[in-house]
């Protein structure tokens, strides 16, 4: 659903149901550290992308389809904010004192189970369990539009043990936010976001796990170099087969590869512009953010 400005402000004061997976380190889209930085105001909230806008656009249609399939359900759309400590949610719809409704869209059925089952992707499961906890209901309906044309429904029952774990985990995460105690980085982006702007001149003794990671990186880089060489040799063979012609086909006429001329790119000559218009260039030149460069040293003989 699309949040109102007031709801967005409220969301800054806690963890929304759709953010629970990130708070617990189980989101495929955002790490705990990334969410922590958003809640602390150290990083902007993720920009709305095309799939998110599409989901917002078709949500009324999916809700309408859900109402058509269940004409006896007393569906109330977009109820007000529900809250319990740092946990909060803005439901797509619900049947008061009976069930929540969480609309989803997906390109494919990958990660989804049988129709009417509770087999939904983990981050969605954590979301609807959180919503059921806040709404104090025992059932969550999840109507889904797959690929823009395939409607289906899933039904998830409340799991009190899982809800307790969610509530405890969100509480711990929010305590970190309030204390200014960031979660440990788990991705390269996390590490860069936390430590990538400045460094101090000092040395750290590598432990056994770090030494193993260094060895793994060296091995992988060597394998990558070998694969790149093999790919380049294969590429050269294919280009020789094409010669001046632009399309390679198999015996059935199916296109295997193309090598076509493209329009020459237009590039802005920064050096020439700076020489011709130094004052204007200076006016529109801004210093970049400081950053650190990681270098993996070659193994000594």
Predicted region positions:
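Accessory terminal regions of nucleic-acid processing enzymes
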Residues: 1-301
């Amino acid at each position: 659903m699309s949040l109102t400005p007031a709801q967005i402000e409220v969301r800054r004061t806690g963890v929304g149901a759709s953010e629970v997976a990130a708070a617990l380190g189980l989101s495929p889209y955002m790490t705990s550290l990334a969410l922590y930085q958003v809640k602390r105001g150290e990083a902007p909230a993720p920009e709305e992308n095309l799939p998110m806008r599409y989901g917002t656009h078709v949500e009324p249609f999916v809700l309408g389809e859900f109402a058509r399939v269940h004409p006896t359900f007393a569906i109330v759309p977009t109820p007000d904010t529900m809250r319990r400590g740092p946990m909060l949610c803005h439901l797509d719809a619900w049947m008061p004192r009976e069930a929540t409704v969480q609309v989803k869209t997906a390109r494919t059925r990958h990660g989804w189970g049988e129709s009417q089952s509770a087999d939904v992707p983990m981050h969605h499961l954590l979301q609807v369990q959180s919503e059921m906890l806040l709404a104090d209901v025992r059932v969550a309906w999840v109507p889904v539009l797959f690929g823009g044309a395939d409607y289906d429904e899933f039904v998830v029952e409340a799991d009190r043990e899982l809800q307790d774990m969610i509530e405890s985990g969100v509480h711990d995460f929010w305590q970190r936010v309030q204390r200014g105690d960031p979660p440990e980085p788990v991705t390269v982006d996390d590490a860069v976001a936390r430590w990538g702007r400045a460094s101090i001149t000092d040395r750290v003794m590598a432990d056994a796990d770090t030494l193993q990671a260094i060895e793994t990186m060296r091995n992988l880089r060597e394998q990558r170099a070998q694969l790149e060489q093999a790919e380049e040799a294969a590429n050269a063979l294919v280009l020789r087969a094409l010669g001046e012609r632009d399309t390679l086909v198999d015996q059935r006429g199916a296109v295997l590869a193309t090598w076509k001329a493209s329009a020459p790119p237009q590039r802005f000559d920064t050096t020439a512009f700076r020489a011709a218009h130094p004052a204007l260039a200076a006016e529109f030149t801004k210093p970049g953010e400081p950053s650190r460069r990681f270098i993996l040293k070659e193994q000594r003989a």
